[in-house]
Regions:
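Mature extracytoplasmic/periplasmic domains
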Residues: 321, 352-437, 476-477
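Periplasmic solute-binding protein
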Residues: 145-161, 175-218, 230, 246-266, ...
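Glycine-centered hinge/linker elements that transmit conformational signals in sensory
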Residues: 228-237, 265-298, 337
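Hinge/lid segment of periplasmic solute-binding proteins
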Residues: 53-62, 116-119, 130, 134, ...
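Conserved N-terminal structural module of periplasmic/extracytoplasmic solute-binding proteins
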Residues: 23-149, 365, 445, 455-459, ...
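Short, solvent-exposed loop/beta-turn-alpha elements that line the ligand-binding surface or hinge
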Residues: 161-173, 209, 217-223, 259-277, ...
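Extracytoplasmic/periplasmic substrate-recognition and gating elements
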Residues: 69, 102, 127, 287, ...
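C-terminal motif of bacterial Sec signal peptides marking the signal peptidase cleavage site
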Residues: 17-21
């Protein structure tokens, strides 16, 4: 069983730092470790099906009890810790890595995602979970959408129902957030306090200078579809602005609107919308309308400042409020200089899910954390007001979207929640696969060679195929 679980945990290894992240306040980039990839390939080649395909996974052998004295939480940054510290009733902070809930000690194990360190640490600890001392067992851990199924489709995560959470408890959560962490047997294996629908975030000063006004309707008319977006990029370029900081800014918008999967019947598939991103990006790079820097690089974030001369970014609430340097008085965000509009297409980006670990002896505490931080409407509203997060609770978001007193300082006091609420209902995960993270990252990495003129499209495509099949040797193309 351990070997089969190892295969499941290692089969979705990563290759680069293109995932969401911004220091200590939002999800951080994750990258592949070569040794992990090699281990996955070796194990997958010699082992039978992962537990998700086993009868045992369907029925579940859930080792969840109460009475534990230490609650171990594994995560990759401070975001969830701050939510628990600030909003969970009865939590007392002791120091940076310890707290208490009643007579239960809370221990935070925070490992940054850089170079896949978080997942590597989590995998190693989960593999030893059955033999670990009670006070050392993982009780609760976090996952992101791009690799959630890696953990959800194993017996290391327990259904939330086994912890005590009911269908009625999660009835007001957005469906896509439940789809992300539903296993192959239809069991809900996690919950999230946030939703991550995205918008186009634009530089108000640039809009006023180039488009004549910075209001929502004026800007939306200039970016209403990709043809119009491209035409506006030329106008912005003539005025000295890049339309986006990098080609990768728009990638999530295109990849979230595909009509086919990355892998179809075991073969790698390039969706027409992914190819459309390539074509638009190449046009913009050649025209000097965007750059080729990696997300989270210094060149990418230069546009957070007026002298960076970037018109727009694409992102959800966490990008706007936690990643655009709002704490730096010289930034556009600190001056309330950004606006928001729907852009050419709706999309989502990121999100963090809370999973209960099989073997926890703090089931009641794990369940109550899930219940309070993801289903309590009053606490959800508190999070919106205090943290400008988009929360995973329909009544809370509908109320806040209609609240004329609410505004986001980064967006000049604008209330973007009606846009987020409209966008979240359109999120479609029907084309999600276990291979998405690796394919998304490898494709962007390979196409950078094409955009920069170091390879033809066909040569870059070969680089992509080589990289993906090294990670997933079972795939063809």
């Amino acid at each position: 069983m351990k070997k089969k679980l190892l295969s499941a945990l290692l089969s979705v290894a990563m290759v680069s730092a293109l995932l969401v992240g911004c220091g200590d306040t939002a999800t951080e980039p994750a990258a592949d470790a070569a040794a992990t990839t090699d281990a996955a390939a070796d194990t997958a080649a010699t082992d039978e099906a992962a537990p998700a395909d086993d009868a045992a996974a369907a029925t579940g052998s859930w080792d969840v009890t109460d009475g534990g004295k230490v609650l171990n939480i594994y995560c990759w940054n401070e975001e969830f810790k701050s939510r628990l510290t600030d909003h969970y009733p009865g939590y007392t902070e002791v120091d940076g890595t310890h707290g208490t809930i009643g007579d239960v000690q809370v221990v935070w194990n925070i490992t940054p995602s850089d170079d896949n360190a978080y997942q590597n640490n989590l995998d190693e600890t989960l593999l030893a979970q059955a033999d670990a001392a009670a006070d050392d067992k993982i009780d609760l851990f976090l996952v992101e959408a791009d690799y959630a199924l890696k953990y959800v489709d194993t017996e290391y995560t327990v259904p939330v129902s086994a912890l005590g959470l009911t269908d009625a408890d999660v009835a007001d959560q957005y469906q896509y957030t439940k789809d992300v962490v539903t296993d192959a047997n239809g069991q809900l294996k996690g919950v999230s306090w946030q939703g991550c629908p995205g918008v186009l975030v634009y530089n108000r000063a640039a809009a006023t200078e180039v488009l004549g006004a910075d209001d929502h309707d004026t800007v939306q008319a200039a970016v209403k579809d990709w043809d119009t977006f491209l035409a506006t990029a030329a106008t912005m370029s003539d005025a000295g602005y890049k339309m986006t900081a990098t080609t990768n800014d728009a990638f999530r918008v295109f990849s979230n609107n595909v009509t086919t999967k990355w892998v179809e019947n075991g073969a790698i598939n390039i969706d027409a919308n992914i190819k459309a991103w390539v074509d638009m990006s190449k046009t913009m790079v050649d025209a000097g309308q965007t750059g080729t820097a990696d997300l989270w690089s210094d060149d990418w974030s230069k546009g957070f400042y007026p002298e960076g001369k970037v018109f727009c970014y694409f992102g959800p609430a966490w990008l706007v409020d936690f990643c655009m340097a709002a704490d730096d008085t010289a930034s556009i965000a600190a001056q309330g200089g950004w606006g928001a509009t729907e852009g050419p297409q709706g999309f989502y980006w990121g999100g963090t899910w809370i999973c209960g670990a099989n073997g926890t002896d703090n089931a009641a505490e794990v369940c109550d954390i899930m219940k309070q931080l993801t289903t309590n409407t009053d606490i959800m509203k508190e999070i919106v007001v205090a943290d400008n997060d988009f929360v995973n609770n329909k009544p809370a978001m509908d109320a806040m979207a209609a609240d004329e007193t609410y505004g986001d300082a980064v967006l000049g006091g604008m209330n973007p929640l009606p846009m987020y609420c409209a966008g979240v209902e359109k999120i479609d995960l029907s084309n999600l696969t276990n291979y998405d993270q690796g394919c998304n990252e490898s494709f962007q990495l390979a196409m950078k060679e094409y955009f920069e003129g170091n390879a033809t499209y066909e040569e870059a495509l070969d680089l992509f195929y080589t990289g993906v099949t090294e990670k997933y040797p079972e795939l063809t193309y």
